[in-house]
Amino acid sequence: MVRAEKGCIAAGHPKTAEAGATILAAGGNAFDAAIAALWMSCVAEPVLASLGGGGFCLTHGAGGDSRIYDFFAQTPRRRRAPAEVDFQPIYADFGVTTQGFHIGVGAAATPGLVRGIFALHRARGSLPMRELVGPAIAAAAGGVTITPFQAYLLSVIGPIYTHTPAARALFTVEDGADEAGAPRRRLWQAGDRVTNPDLADALDALAREGDALFYGDDDGGPPAPGTIAAAISRLSADHGGHLDADDLRSYRTLEREPLRLGYRDAHLLTNPPPASGGLLIAFGLALLAGHDVSALSFADPDRAALLAAVMAATRDARRDRGVTPELLDPALLRAYAEALAAPPATRGTTHISVIDRDANAASITVSNGEGCGAIIPGTGSMLNNMLGEEDINPGGADAWPLDARMGSMMAPTAIFADDGRLCVLGSGGSKRIRTAILQVLVNLIDHRMSLREAVEAPRIHLEGARLNWEAGLPAEVAEALARAYPEHTAWPERNMYFGGVHAVIREADGELHGVGDPRRAGVCLGDARDAS
């Protein structure tokens, strides 16, 4: 457990957490720390975060004001003819299961991350942007060491990161020579120290020139030569993409009211529609509210069966009703709650949570999808493949609505307990985000687990008719689940497949501490970086 005085941050990489902790120690607020960590994640976690991606930030000010900043991907304003589009299938191998995606420049939607960072800074930041981006510039220029988790990610989706010559040059290193004497290259491995000078230069330029460098000016003309906007427009035009200068120029960060809900003795804030994750979590909690979950021990098979049934009901409601506020209609909830009494029928994201000593809090989830395989020239950053993710674009290559903010499972969340505690959390994990967060919430609120226990407890996830569960479930629970769900997968270890919940809590007395999820190599640091 990490405890801190000025602030606490949990994130998916040591350098990401360190960047935020450094800013907290320098007197920055939670939002400054989150921005610094987000820049660093693009350097240290390039498979999960990129200048070419997007995300969501839940902010809560010490004065009580809360907002969602939506800087997720936007569909292009125009659609090219299918014969012109670069859109190719690829599969990620998690060992015991696979998940399909599509890549190519035609899979890229309008990225929002850079505009979102600047919008958050203008609204909530207290330190100069140059100071916040400084640690990331230094790391990109001086090098970061590849962690085992980052190496594992590359091994899972390696074909994407060697898909183009520019990607191969960036994400591989020389590894001797072949029999003919030609240089041989391999993907980054754990322990490699790698630099990204193009990214360092791009970050430096963004700190000086602002987000217009990435999105272009609002004058309606073509992007100026040498800008990132011009590079993206040219990449898309030449390599089968839909994006053009109008998409970039018109992109805006959207501010929304968080979705608010009550559960037991806690009040929760999470991501509202059009993102789907928060609403589906709210639906699941509303179903659980009619059950005395606290009376079921973690080792009770009935507890796991109830959670699996709630996941199935949520899946069915999403399929039958869509992801709209109608899901929280009391009559609809009663119908699905009654169904729970019946026997059951037979991606890349990362998260940052920060709270400072004044109780300012930020919960940020970002994603680059899996990346489309193409590097934005001059930036050392891969463009997203959001149009190629079936979960948020089920229509595929040419059936998406024009110029629309895309939905997402991402659900940065805050919990306000009646006793004065504040917790911010969120998860990566594509389709598993909502089930990971739901289970951690139940562990915290119903079972009164410590933050570490709640995050590290084994999880289950229902995907279609197949129930997945992690190693560590009591044998009696696993046996009962296997009987109830003939189509199942028992994972031999805790795995990133089940998400990565990084969380920070502020106790009623002001004490700050947090936990990074070991499934995704999570790290938690305080301003003094004093782990105990």
Question: Which stretches of residues belong to each language-model region?
Answer:
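Noncatalytic scaffold domains of N-terminal-nucleophile
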Residues: M1-E18, T22, A30-E209, Y215, ...
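Active-site rim segments in enzyme catalytic domains, especially the processed small/beta chain
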Residues: A44-S50, G54-Y69, T75, E84, ...
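Short, small/polar residue-rich loop motifs at catalytic or cofactor-binding pockets
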Residues: E255, T346-T349, S408-M410
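Internal maturation/activation junctions in enzymes
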Residues: G290-S367, E487
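Extended C-terminal subregions enriched in glycine
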Residues: D320, T324, D358, A404, ...
